[in-house]
Amino acid sequence: MGLETEKADVQLFMDDDSYSHHSGLEYADPEKFADSDQDRDPHRLNSHLKLGFEDVIAEPVTTHSFDKVWICSHALFEISKYVMYKFLTVFLAIPLAFIAGILFATLSCLHIWILMPFVKTCLMVLPSVQTIWKSVTDVIIAPLCTSVGRCFSSVSLQLSQD
């Protein structure tokens, strides 16, 4: 530990093909990222959110509405669910992702730089604390518990039925 006196040797290599000489912005090809078969929940974190119309609205066999009402309500349910989800994700996904990123970065930093050094320090000090605690237990708590146990061992109860 101390001051580093060696110079770091850093080099940057760039191909002429990958470096653009004009000052305009280059955007990624959106068709490359628009894979509709992509599984966006590979660990099935939100498998409980797969709700259909029948999971929310159900009519028993004895009471049915008109078929047209059922079909229209089903279509309206699916359309409104789709549109509202898209609308909410447009306005909430980026800010919430930003907030979650800040939160996870903060928690990671606290865990790495505060919590784990504290735990490691406690584990280093623990053997000496364990020795002191064992001495206190042997000197104070063990004789007290033994005395109380002997006092209560002489108590006897007898039940009689009158």
Curated annotation (Swiss-Prot):
GO terms for biological process: basement membrane organization; caveola assembly; cell differentiation; endoplasmic reticulum organization; endothelial cell proliferation; insulin receptor signaling pathway; mitochondrion organization; negative regulation of endothelial cell proliferation. One of its GO terms (cellular component) is cytoplasmic vesicle. Disulfide bonds: none annotated. The modification Phosphoserine is found at residues 20, 23, 36. Residues 1-86, 108-162 are cytoplasmic. Residues 87-107 dip into the membrane without crossing it. The modification Phosphotyrosine is found at residues 19, 27. Keywords: Cell membrane, Cytoplasm, Golgi apparatus, Membrane, Nucleus, Phosphoprotein. The keyword Acetylation does not apply. It is found in: Nucleus; Cytoplasm; Golgi apparatus membrane; Cell membrane. InterPro entries: Caveolin, Caveolin_CS. Its main location: nucleus. It is a peripheral membrane protein. Phosphorylated on serine and tyrosine residues. CAV1 promotes phosphorylation on Ser-23 which then targets the complex to the plasma membrane, lipid rafts and caveolae. Phosphorylation on Ser-36 appears to modulate mitosis in endothelial cells. Phosphorylation on both Tyr-19 and Tyr-27 is required for insulin-induced 'Ser-727' phosphorylation of STAT3 and its activation. Phosphorylation on Tyr-19 is required for insulin-induced phosphorylation of MAPK1 and DNA binding of STAT3. Tyrosine phosphorylation is induced by both EGF and insulin. One of its GO terms (molecular function) is protein kinase binding. Coiled coil: none annotated. The keyword Phosphoprotein applies. May act as a scaffolding protein within caveolar membranes. Interacts directly with G-protein alpha subunits and can functionally regulate their activity. Acts as an accessory protein in conjunction with CAV1 in targeting to lipid rafts and driving caveolae formation. The Ser-36 phosphorylated form has a role in modulating mitosis in endothelial cells. Positive regulator of cellular mitogenesis of the MAPK signaling pathway. Required for the insulin-stimulated nuclear translocation and activation of MAPK1 and STAT3, and the subsequent regulation of cell cycle progression. Monomer or homodimer. Interacts with CAV1; the interaction forms a stable heterooligomeric complex that is required for targeting to lipid rafts and for caveolae formation. Tyrosine phosphorylated forms do not form heterooligomers with the Tyr-19-phosphorylated form existing as a monomer or dimer, and the Tyr-27-form as a monomer only. Interacts (tyrosine phosphorylated form) with the SH2 domain-containing proteins, RASA1, NCK1 and SRC. Interacts (tyrosine phosphorylated form) with INSR, the interaction (Tyr-27-phosphorylated form) is increased on insulin stimulation. Belongs to the caveolin family. PANTHER family: CAVEOLIN, CAVEOLIN-2. This is Caveolin-2. It comes from Homo sapiens (Human).
